[in-house]
Amino acid sequence: MDHSCQTLTTVSTPDPFMVFANGSYYLTFTSGDKIEIWASKTLNGFEETARKETIWTPPPGTAHSADLWAPELHAIYGRWYVYYAAAHPKHGNKSHRMYVLGGPPAHEDPTQGQWEFLGRIHGMPDQWAIDGTVFELHGGLYMVYSGWPLDSDDESDLMQQLFIMKLDDPTMAADGASGEPVAISTPEQPWEFSRDANGDHGINEGPQFLESPDGGWKGIVYSCAGSWTHEYKLAVLHYSGGDPLDPRAWPKGQEPLLQAGWGRQGPLWARARKLPVFGWQWRQRR
């Protein structure tokens, strides 16, 4: 097993997400006012060899034209999709919602085909939401995202939970109760909090569904505490089986998975993919 650490870029690429498809590596990351994809046939010298394409720039002044965060590129049911959070330029962070773009067929290069704006996830509540990721489990399609509590009008941003919801298709929540978001993780451990002048921030965000190569382990790795602090770390929800919409199916680890030591570096954002060079344990930190 290769445990080497490889630097892919020398420039800032926050919230990175990488997939390998059709013989190429595709990287998306937070660009702020647009959605970019970098594509290369190799990880060696990735930044120098990558073709850098902007696939979407929102019309100015719209509800989704500011602070485009954490785009993820997924091939689902034969088509490319990008999921991302965006805000209204006049309303700021409190207006962040999840959006989706539809692209070319999955067998084609996503940097070369046409992309269209498909809007918000249909059937999703009008809730502050970021960091949405999608995955298939037991034949169903699910989205997990970070959101403010559904049962509160508080916009102080002191609490971020992880929610799961079932999708009927890549753009629409399932009908009935199965399409309603369910909180599967609420900050409760001391190491999930950070304090600043506004109070104690309990933060769960950046979820990523992972599965071991043999399928023996499934779960969600997520980031917690304040990303602006030295306390930011990674933690795990283990999928224990049963209904993915049952919070009891996602027991939380009793300690962080990965956290900073005394040095200047620490974990921020976890992504893992089956890649032909490094295997499923390849990681890229935000």
What would you call each of these model-derived segments?
Residues 1-286:
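Carbohydrate-active catalytic/glycan-binding domains of CAZyme proteins
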